Amino acid sequence: RSSASPHLFIKAVELIEQEGFISKAPVAERPSILAARELRSAFFTRAEDVSDWDVQREIAGLLHVDFDNILNKLKTGEAIARLTKDYDLAQLHGIEGSPTYVINEGRQKLFGNVSYGVIAANVNEMLASQGVDAASLC
């Protein structure tokens, strides 16, 4: 099994969002964000095979996204093209896994099981030093 199928599903939902077929919503409420959350929940809490199109179809239904539109993005190659761009960006920025946070224009990278405190310290340091040409203390 592969995680590529659920990633393609998310990319298809993103494309549909951008084309206006899904109403605009705040970031946390966008169908693509909710789809990613539902896929994680299905995988980690219910031990479902999220590469299975039936599972993805069910999630699309929960989110009121037409699964035929998703399939169209897969058939036309648009979803794989978008996912490939993400993979190319990951290589460019040296992303080796998830989660990875790239900050300070790529000069800092937080990878793996990083505590909220470490993330907050880095973000707060960046906000405090905006416009200052100095090295981060984090």
Report each predicted region and the residues it spans.
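C-terminal cap of thioredoxin/glutaredoxin-like
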Residues: S23, V27, L34-C138
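Ordered, amphipathic secondary-structure segments that act as subunit-interaction surfaces
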Residues: R1-G20
